[in-house]
């Protein structure tokens, strides 16, 4: 396989210039709307919220003691911070210089948290939505150039497939917070025609769930943070054996409500577009491979934790044949794990064959 040959070439070069190679730090970065997951070639891995917090006023500045804070710490201090999420629907906002500055603060923090050495050559593979625009990828690479030596942006579902060794006759469905990315893997680097990006994903589910709950219980005090907590605890499609009840607040007092039907409605609202996209990509394979593809449908991302998902999709695909639908074992890190593996197996000088690259 060509990857193996290139990996061997890199190994030869490492033995020739071992001193330089051992100072190369590889990063696999799954840069998400809600969370960013990172793995490094030195065994470090971490997850943080994709958010930057800035003091709302001088009191907030006094409490914080610095101009801004990134990640989970920012979210915990949200009462006196202005929270900025630099990624919308999985891609960087291009609205203003302020938005770009927020994204730069996030990316700088991510790389710093990987703990590179002073003399390290930092090489990062960064995941983006399957159909991210060229302009958006160029913007991300421009910022990456400020904090790493070489960067490659690749499709997020392709990263998952690479990490799982599923690069042929496979459909990967990555349900994130901002986007659901669906990719047909055919043994080559996927092109635009092999990929679909849907904006109905985790954040959309939160909004639908909040509205569905308030429709039944208008007295509740609700926001998307509460809806997200309900989703993470009870999300399901299909049938559920027992009632889902959650403790809310109404007029400041605790009240427990049955949210089973609301959760079902919100979660299943994602499914029609996903099923339709799988069907379209399935038909793009040569007919002799389609039965094999049906045996290799993989769900990844936070949305793959929805209970009953595999069985639900398998049933919806029944007209096409007997499908084997699975969910990844580690939705949090499978994307960046694939990115790191790609970075380590393929020398950076060949990254331009896979996607957009900076620093070469």
From Swiss-Prot:
Pfam families the record matches: MreB_Mbl (PF06723)
SUPFAM superfamilies: Actin-like ATPase domain (SSF53067)
Subcellular location: Cytoplasm; Cytoplasm, Cytoskeleton
InterPro entries reported for this sequence: Actin, ATPase_NBD, MreB_MamK-like
Binding site for ATP: 22, 33-34, 89, 177-179, 231-235, 302
EC number(s) from the headed UniProt entry: 3.6.1.-
Self-association state and partner proteins as the record states: Forms cytoplasmic filaments. Interacts with MamJ. Forms filaments in the absence of other magnetosome proteins and in E.coli. Filament formation in vitro requires ATP, GTP or a non-hydrolyzable ATP analog.
Protein name: Actin-like protein MamK
Record lineage: Bacteria, Pseudomonadati, Pseudomonadota, Alphaproteobacteria, Rhodospirillales
């Amino acid at each position: 396989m060509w990857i193996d040959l290139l990996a061997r070439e890199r190994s030869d070069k490492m033995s020739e210039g071992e001193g330089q190679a051992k100072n190369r730090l590889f990063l696999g970065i799954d840069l998400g709307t809600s969370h960013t997951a990172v793995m490094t070639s030195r065994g470090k891995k971490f997850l943080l919220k994709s958010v930057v917090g800035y003091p709302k006023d001088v009191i907030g500045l006094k409490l914080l003691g610095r101009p801004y804070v990134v990640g989970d710490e920012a979210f915990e201090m949200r009462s006196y911070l202005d929270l900025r999420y630099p990624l919308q629907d999985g891609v960087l906002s291009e609205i203003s210089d302020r938005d770009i500055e927020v994204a730069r603060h996030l990316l700088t923090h991510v790389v710093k948290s990987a703990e590179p050495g002073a003399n390290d050559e930092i090489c990062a593979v960064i995941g983006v939505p399957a159909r991210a625009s060229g302009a958006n990828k160029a913007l991300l690479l421009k910022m990456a150039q400020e904090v790493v030596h070489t960067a490659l942006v690749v499709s997020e579902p392709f990263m998952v497939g690479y990490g799982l060794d599923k690069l042929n006759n496979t459909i990967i469905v990555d349900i994130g917070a901002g986007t659901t990315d669906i990719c047909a893997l055919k043994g080559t680097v996927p092109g635009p025609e092999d990929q679909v990006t849907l904006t109905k994903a985790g954040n959309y589910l939160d909004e639908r769930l909040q509205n569905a709950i308030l429709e039944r219980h208008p007295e509740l005090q609700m926001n998307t943070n509460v809806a997200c907590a309900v989703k993470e605890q009870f999300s399901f499609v299909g049938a559920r054996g027992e009632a889902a009840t959650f403790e809310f607040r109404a007029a400041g007092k605790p009240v427990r409500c049955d949210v089973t039907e609301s959760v079902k409605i919100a979660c299943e609202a994602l499914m029609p577009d996903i099923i339709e996209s799988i069907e379209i990509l399935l038909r793009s394979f040569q007919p002799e491979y389609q039965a094999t593809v049906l045996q290799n449908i993989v769900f990844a991302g936070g949305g793959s934790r929805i209970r009953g998902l595999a069985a639900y999709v398998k049933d919806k695909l029944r007209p096409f044949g007997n499908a084997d639908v699975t969910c990844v074992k580690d939705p949090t890190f499978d994307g960046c794990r694939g990115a790191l593996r790609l970075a380590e197996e393929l020398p950076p000088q060949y990254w331009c064959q896979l996607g957009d690259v900076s620093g070469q």
